[in-house]
Amino acid sequence: MAMSPGPLFLVFLLGLVVIPPTLSQDDSRYTKFLTQHYDAKPKGRDDRYCESMMVKRKLTSFCKDVNTFIHDTKNNIKAICGKKGSPYGRNLRISKSHFQVTTCTHKGRSPRPPCRYRASKGFRYIIIGCENGWPVHFDESFISP
């Protein structure tokens, strides 16, 4: 007499098929977030920094109008998705403390490379989008009134 797989085993197999794509989607969105917005230890924070980082991170196939780099640890940024952040608007979180950032603003007229950027630096609250506890979208930063 052949034994058929039990319902629990089938649920387990279904979990193997469904869960990995979800995790890999979160991972790729988090990786993209890090590529676009994370630089823990910047070397300089002037216009040349912006221009070299935008090229290094491959953000200049068309000149991006604005991009912000966050200078802190991955864990501190991720913590905004939890206790170090507060709900803000729809599906966003605002940091409870300031983060050191450099914002790169395109200063050319053409959207085509070579791209030239103006750097502005400071300590700001940041607003990010999170999925499953991971930062996946940078929304904005501002200095509190």
Swiss-Prot record:
The active site is at H37, H137. Disulfide bonds join C50-C104, C63-C115, C81-C130. Divalent metal ions, such as Cu2+ and Zn2+, may inhibit the ribonucleolytic activity. The record marks K64 as: Critical for catalytic activity. A motif (Nucleolar localization signal) lies at residues 55-59. Pfam families: RnaseA (PF00074). Its EC number is 3.1.27.-. InterPro entries: RNaseA (IPR001427), RNaseA-like_dom_sf (IPR036816), RNaseA_AS (IPR023411), RNaseA_domain (IPR023412). Expressed (at protein level) in macrophages. Its main location: cytoplasm. Zn(2+) binds at D65, H106, H137. GO terms for biological process: angiotensin-activated signaling pathway; cardiac muscle hypertrophy; cell growth involved in cardiac muscle cell development; cellular response to glucose stimulus; gene expression; renal absorption. Residues 1-24 form the signal peptide. One of its GO terms (cellular component) is extracellular region. The keyword Nucleus applies. It comes from the Eukaryota. Keywords: Cytoplasmic vesicle, Disulfide bond, DNA-binding, Endonuclease, Hydrolase, Metal-binding, Nuclease, Nucleus, Secreted, Signal, Zinc. It is an enzyme of class 3 (hydrolase). It is found in: Cytoplasmic vesicle, Secretory vesicle lumen; Secreted; Nucleus, Nucleolus. Gene3D superfamilies: Ribonuclease A-like domain. GO terms for molecular function: DNA binding; endonuclease activity; metal ion binding; RNA nuclease activity. Belongs to the pancreatic ribonuclease family. Has ribonuclease activity (in vitro). Seems to lack angiogenic activity. Homodimer. This is Angiogenin-2. It comes from Mus musculus (Mouse). The lineage of its organism: Eukaryota, Metazoa, Chordata, Craniata, Vertebrata. The gene is Ang2.
